[in-house]
Swiss-Prot record:
This is Cytosolic Fe-S cluster assembly factor NAR1. [4Fe-4S] cluster 1 binds at residues 20, 61, 64, 67. [4Fe-4S] cluster 2 binds at residues 208, 263, 464, 468. One of its GO terms (molecular function) is 4 iron, 4 sulfur cluster binding. It comes from Neosartorya fischeri (strain ATCC 1020 / DSM 3700 / CBS 544.65 / FGSC A1164 / JCM 1740 / NRRL 181 / WB 181).
Length: 597
């Protein structure tokens, strides 16, 4: 095979590692029952031994670098719809009562009981996938989820305790907070001299767990460039557990948080040791010995359909309208309630993309700070690589940024940022890695001119081609055909055998419908949308006021609530193990609750 093209460049899927260091203990083999020790037995006459199946849990994967990404390719026994059902049936719901004179909700149950408060957070990409599947609007998809999780005709209609979720929040709320803090992080990084806890320039987004997994395991030199901010999922978990535990006087372990996401890799993110109450809670005996995850369980959009099917419920048959006031419980704090359940719309436009709009928000903030400036867009060698330059009124570049989606493009970005090779020969000049990378890419002469990577101020990086609406956990065409069997009969002219396998055209059309539903969230919203640049600064100011209020309310610094850290994951696969305690060390790593991917 030519050195210019390798098999890894043909697609974006990175399979699990060949060698898995998961230690599987087995009993010694049974001794032969034959009376004659010299008897020869043919292999086809030997009865196969029924060995117990090896089970690999999520925490085992966190301590191993044998696999670089694609958590959906690993058989995971935890964080599934089964865990949701088992938890709902295992713990009774903690009684809550609304007290109007005290501006919030009170806990009327026992703080020491085994009861739980069930809360959930839902990403907008999940609602878009449901909307495209059932032919409804994004807002109706929100009503569908609320009715299923909180309403009397949903989960509360069955189960051992008739449990449901008390609050279901939109991760867009915490996404807005992350956007505001991202703009601050980029600003401070540009003004910084390179010291302190700020990431190095260019700052790379850190909301995609598949990308973080890849960086921690294969390219540790990238880690100083990663944004220190939590993802909207993680920040939602920190917010819910910190506020509710303080306001209701319960332990964070009594608050069970479910996240519904478009991506399987979000399950790995939720299992990180850095994303537990140890990072933000006050030091106590419980938090030191038993860390409590900010997100207890993550299920995908497809698993949401499986969850409903397991309870014998049909999502499209649920009322597509808002829950009555009798089914809604006010949040314990009125100020936080008005922000958390705001009716205003979020910025989900074609320009911002389908992955949260981190890059777009940074550009809009800097454009608002520089009146008369304009954003110039330059497409890269494919649709998933886009460069942006903020030009002043005098046509001077003020800020350069880029968007890289998909692992093929991420690998090109990593090559650009890789440090130069240091020659061991005295007097030799360092050899830049980018030069060899460019020699492997002869097609660049026909592509749009690309930046060097180091001149970017910010890069939005996502593992999935096309962004988060194309996440691995989204509803596939096959799932949509099963959920709505008559939806494609009128338009499909293929035979049943041919129609069973979606064509690339059908897959692109499906993704286009999901994207359309995602972008239509603003038109479905009950609030008004302001597009003036000054509104961006005004909105960021309100978000900073909210973050300050949250931090002061629970008496925890914002640096402990909104920021996290990353670490290099070293692999023992293929290394010579001379020390006698290597196996014990691997067992210890595999038994950890987290600490890297």
């Amino acid at each position: 095979m030519s050195a210019i093209l390798s098999a890894d460049d043909l697609n974006d899927f990175i399979s699990p590692g060949v060698a898995c260091i998961k230690p599987v203990e087995s009993l010694p083999q049974k001794e032969s029952q034959s009376e004659n020790p010299y008897e020869v037995t043919k292999e086809d006459k030997v009865q196969p031994e029924n060995l117990p199946p090896a089970q690999i849990s999520l925490t085992d994967c966190l301590a191993c670098s044998g696999c670089v990404t694609s958590a959906e390719a690993v058989l995971i026994s935890l964080q599934s719809h089964t865990e949701v059902l088992n938890t709902l049936d295992l713990y009774p719901e903690l009684p809550l009562d609304f007290a109007s004179d005290q501006r919030g909700t009170q806990n009327v149950g026992s703080a020491d009981s085994d009861s739980r408060i069930f809360v959930a957070s839902v990403s907008p990409q999940v609602r878009a996938s449901l909307a495209a599947t059932y032919g409804i609007t994004e807002r109706e998809a929100k009503y569908m989820i609320d009715q299923f999780l909180m309403g009397p005709h949903g989960l509360r209609a069955g189960g051992k305790h008739g449990n449901g979720f008390t609050w279901v929040v939109d991760t867009n709320v915490m996404r807005e907070a992350v956007l505001a803090l991202t703009a601050d992080e980029v600003t401070n990084s540009l003004l910084s001299t390179g010291s302190g806890s700020l990431p190095k320039s260019p700052i790379l987004s850190s909301a995609c767990p598949g990308w973080i997994c890849y960086a921690e395991k294969t390219h540790p030199f990238i880690l100083p460039h990663l944004s220190r901010l939590k993802s909207p999922q993680a920040l939602s978990g920190t917010f819910l557990k910190s506020v509710l535990s303080k306001a209701l006087g319960v332990s964070p372990s009594q608050i069970w948080h479910l996240a519904i996401m478009p991506c399987f890799d979000k399950k790995l993110e939720a299992s990180r040791e850095e994303l537990t109450d140890i990072a933000w809670a006050s030091t106590s005996a419980e938090s030191q010995t038993t860390p409590v995850r900010d997100v207890d369980c993550v299920i995908t959009t497809r698993e949401l359909l499986t969850l409903a099917s397991a309870r014998g419920l049909s999502l499209p048959n649920l009322p597509l309208k808002a829950l009555p006031a009798s089914c809604s419980t006010p949040f314990p704090d009125q100020a936080l309630d008005s922000f958390l359940f705001s009716k205003s719309s979020s910025d989900q436009t074609v320009e911002s993309g389908t992955s949260g709009g981190y890059l777009h928000h940074v550009l809009k903030i800097f454009q608002a700070r520089n009146p008369g400036s304009k954003i110039v867009t330059q497409r890269g060698r494919n649709a998933d690589v886009v460069e942006y330059v903020l030009m002043s009124s005098g046509d001077e570049p003020l800020l350069k940024a880029a968007r890289y989606y998909g692992f093929r493009n991420i690998q090109n970005l990593v090559r650009k940022l890789k440090p130069a090779r240091v020659s061991r020969l005295p007097g030799a000049k360092p050899q830049a890695v980018t030069s060899s990378a460019n020699r492997r890419q002869p097609m660049s002469r026909n592509a749009a001119p690309a930046g060097t990577g180091a001149d970017y101020a910010y890069v939005e990086v996502m593992a999935c081609p096309g962004g988060c609406t194309n996440g691995g956990g989204q509803i596939r065409i096959e799932d949509a055909r099963e959920a709505v069997p008559n939806a494609l009969k009128e338009t499909s002219t293929e035979t049943p055998v041919a129609a069973s396998k979606p064509t690339p055209h059908e897959q692109r059309a499906r993704l286009a419908r999901v994207d359309e539903a995602y972008y239509s969230a603003d038109s479905d919203s009950e609030g008004s949308v302001t597009t003036e640049p000054v509104s961006v600064l005004s909105r960021d100011t309100k978000i900073h006021e909210f973050l300050k209020y949250w931090s002061e309310k629970i008496d925890i610094p914002l640096s402990q609530l909104a920021y996290t850290s990353y670490r290099e994951v070293e692999s023992d696969v293929g290394k010579t193990q001379n020390a006698p305690n290597e196996t014990a060390r691997v067992v210890e790593l595999a038994g950890k609750i987290g600490g890297g991917w």
